[in-house]
Amino acid sequence: MKKAKLIFKDNTPFSLDFDDFYFNSKDGLNESKFVYTHSFEWKNQENFIITESGFGIGLNFFLTLKRFLETTPSKRPKKLFYISVEAFYIEKEQLREIYQKLRFYEEFKELLEHFLKFYPKAKEGIYRFYFEDCFLDLVFEDITILKELDFKADVWYLDGFSPNKNSQMFDENLIFEVARLSKKNTQICTFSSASFLQKNLKKYGFRVEKTKGFRKREMIKAYLENELEFKDKEAYFSRTFSSLKNKKVAIIGAGISSAVLAYELSLRGFKIDVFEKHLELGKGASGNESGILSSLILKSKVKLGEFSELSFIEASRFYRQILDLNFKGVVEFAHNDLMQERFDTQRENVLFKISKNQAFLEEGGVIFPKNLVKNLFEKSKACIYFNHEFQAYKFENECFTLKFKNDIVKSDYAVLIYAMGADTKDFVFYDEMKLSKVRGQVTHLKPFLDTQFPLSSKAYICPIKDDLQVIGASYDRLDASLESKEEDDKQNIENIAEFIDKNTKLEIIGSKVGFRSYSSDRFMIVGNAYDEAFYKEEYKALLWTKDKEQKPAKMSCNLYFNFAHGSRGFSTSVLAARYLCALINNEPLCLEKKYIHAIHPARFLVRKLKKGL
């Protein structure tokens, strides 16, 4: 990612990249309020979306958030979504220094320090920050990333230096995307009154009004008169907006994917009931005593690897923001030539500090799955029903009725979510969706290696916890045994041989078996359940029509999937939960289209149809 070249000129931040000030050198605070943050009215609605082109030092965001929090809740939206795109990275310490030099620091100190605490490294991606009743999605990408995003903004801040020095931020391509991502009466706020900007806005349906700008300047405001119609060539992957009879949600399964989702849903005011077939938490794969938060390291520009990296960093930031966890890092080792090739292509990746055959992932570390899941459920205030083995559902009058073993029935749920991990294989039967149930066994040893970092190679070693040390894990697609096996413990020990002296005596004090859920392409399966018969009929000619407009997809109403997280559920569950909340609650989708397509439940069928099969 490009780093901003920034100096101070007239006591104001000045960009050497664009030969322009970040804002008015005389009275930047009041100009920002006048042009952007105080130039529109709040609407008393569920979600309010503001999108900004050019985050800069974040002044517009902090002013907006301050205004939002100071407004009486009954006179503002319930949730503020603020999406800001920035292509030039400013270092954390430099941001703090800028606020101090401008004498803004004390005014924004609390909000700014919270922001800086979770500020990411200089790497492209979408990074979420949690504030009171507000989500900030900071998008570190070029502005062309808008074509990959999906939301309907209420207000746009078109910022980003003078149009004659940064024309890309105001050109026709950008304004088309702005119009696509807007709804009727969406307001455009901008300091500019450039004629070519006015022309582009009018071309895509905005009503443009000239108005007096800050002090002597002239500026424009614009309003979308009618929502833009455009041809969707990939409608089979597009969202369908949800309509809910109530805010009751049922989640089947009580592992990590369920726990993160329950927490995220609780932030949106949903009442969550969780149904678990076991008698307590921690009986499945999410119940290990210790585990590792880490990322796959694949060759650069491999989509699965890029998604794993984003999932990992966002999970780390989520656990730090929500559970106040601290991570000391994890060390990954290249244990064969293929792994070494992968490491060699990632030497410039800021997530991986690579030296020879080692990679240090600073944002990773040891996790304690059992406690983590328990804490998230407690925060969500979800009601967990143990000893409830799910069997079937009915959907009538816009609500689900659930049937469980022993003739137990629960009803009146507007949303049903499958998050039962490896057990999903027994409930989902799409023709092209191939699911695997993979057995894994971890071994509990008497402490034998004093390490503050988890070590991961052929197998992994966790730091000591409560007089035991966890190593693992075995991997067997063909074994369905629930009992621990001596040969698996032996294999786990053999796989950590590179970390210990051959004369070290290891004492086994226990083992634990769990089952992972995998898809055939290793991406998780997250999103709406779909109408298979509709897809097969409507999209049967995709081989010949894939470059033409497609009819909107038909989904199974308010039934959602959240499974196939494999062995990295503690990473992938965070993005999965946010994405599902966005679908359920009609929020901005927090993922790029390429990743939405990669995790979509219908992707396997669509691939087959595109081949004419």
UniProtKB/Swiss-Prot annotation:
It comes from Campylobacter jejuni subsp. doylei (strain ATCC BAA-1458 / RM4099 / 269.97). It is found in: Cytoplasm. GO terms for molecular function: oxidoreductase activity, acting on the CH-NH group of donors; tRNA (5-methylaminomethyl-2-thiouridylate)(34)-methyltransferase activity. Residues 252-613 are annotated as: FAD-dependent cmnm(5)s(2)U34 oxidoreductase. This is tRNA 5-methylaminomethyl-2-thiouridine biosynthesis bifunctional protein MnmC. PANTHER family: SARCOSINE DEHYDROGENASE-RELATED, TRNA 5-METHYLAMINOMETHYL-2-THIOURIDINE BIOSYNTHESIS BIFUNCTIONAL PROTEIN MNMC. Pfam families: DAO, Methyltransf_30. The keyword Membrane does not apply. The keyword Cytoplasm applies. The gene is mnmC. GO terms for cellular component: cytoplasm. It comes from the Bacteria. Its cofactor is FAD. Residues 1-225 are annotated as: tRNA (mnm(5)s(2)U34)-methyltransferase. Its EC number is 2.1.1.61, 1.5.-.-. InterPro entries: FAD-dep_OxRdtase, FAD/NAD-bd_sf, MnmC-like_methylTransf, SAM-dependent_MTases_sf, tRNA_MAMT_biosynth_bifunc_MnmC, tRNA_MNMC2, tRNA_S-uridine_synth_MnmC_C. It catalyses: 5-aminomethyl-2-thiouridine(34) in tRNA + S-adenosyl-L-methionine = 5-methylaminomethyl-2-thiouridine(34) in tRNA + S-adenosyl-L-homocysteine + H(+). In the N-terminal section; belongs to the methyltransferase superfamily. tRNA (mnm(5)s(2)U34)-methyltransferase family. One of its GO terms (biological process) is methylation. Catalyzes the last two steps in the biosynthesis of 5-methylaminomethyl-2-thiouridine (mnm(5)s(2)U) at the wobble position (U34) in tRNA. Catalyzes the FAD-dependent demodification of cmnm(5)s(2)U34 to nm(5)s(2)U34, followed by the transfer of a methyl group from S-adenosyl-L-methionine to nm(5)s(2)U34, to form mnm(5)s(2)U34. Its main location: cytoplasm. Keywords: Cytoplasm, FAD, Flavoprotein, Methyltransferase, Multifunctional enzyme, Oxidoreductase, S-adenosyl-L-methionine, Transferase, tRNA processing.
